[in-house]
Amino acid sequence: NRYLGLRRDEQGRFLLRVEPGVVLSELRKQLSKKVLPTAGWDQASLKAYDEFQEAPEQFFPTDPTEASACLGGMAACNASGARSYAYGPIRPHITGLHVALADGDLLELQRGEAFAQGRHLSLVTAAGRTLELDLPGYTMPKTKNASGYFVADDMDAIDLFIGACGTLGVVTELEIALQAAPAVVWGVSCFFD
C-alpha cells in the first residue's frame, strides 16, 4: 500500500506509481491535500512532487461505488462508476503495470510500448523469456461490458491485464494518470410523484 514515485509525461500529466493495496479514499484525501507519502522516492520523483504541489489540484477520476476499494482490485475488475460516462472506466487511466505471473516471472508493461499484431501478442518477461499469446477472436461489444478478457486487433498489451480479475497474473505495481480537478462539480437529484 505504498506510494512509489511520481513523474510527468510528455503531455504534462502527473503519473503516480503505487502498490495495489493503496485505498481509493486515502488517495483522494491525499490528492486533495497535495500531500503524498514520499519515503524512499528518488530525486526525479521528488522533483515531480515539488511540481505537483505547485500545480492545480489533481484527482483520480475513476469512482467506483465503494471508496474503500484498493487500486489493485479496481484494476483487476476495470472499475467504473458514476463518472464513467465522462471519464471512462479505470483502463485508460492506468499507464503502467507490473504483473507477477503464475510461474514467478514478472512482466513490466507500459502503455504505448507493446502492441498485438492483429490478435497475436508477444511479451518479454523480466527474465528475458518471450511469451507468444494468441488472443481470443470474439468481438467486444460497444457497450459497457465486464465479461471476458478485453481483446481487440492491434491492442495495447496492458489492456489485456486490466479487467482480467487476476487470472493472467497478480498486479504488484500500478502507474496511474492524474488529471486536473474540475473547478466545479454539480450533482442533480430529481423527485417525481
Stretches found by the model and what they are:
Residues 12-13:
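Structural motif
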Residues 1:
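Short basic, glycine-rich beta-strand/loop surfaces that mediate nucleic-acid
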Residues 4-6, 25, 29-33, 37-193:
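FAD-binding subdomain of flavoenzyme oxidoreductases
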Residues 21:
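Extended, alpha-helix-rich binding/interface surfaces that flank or overlap catalytic cores
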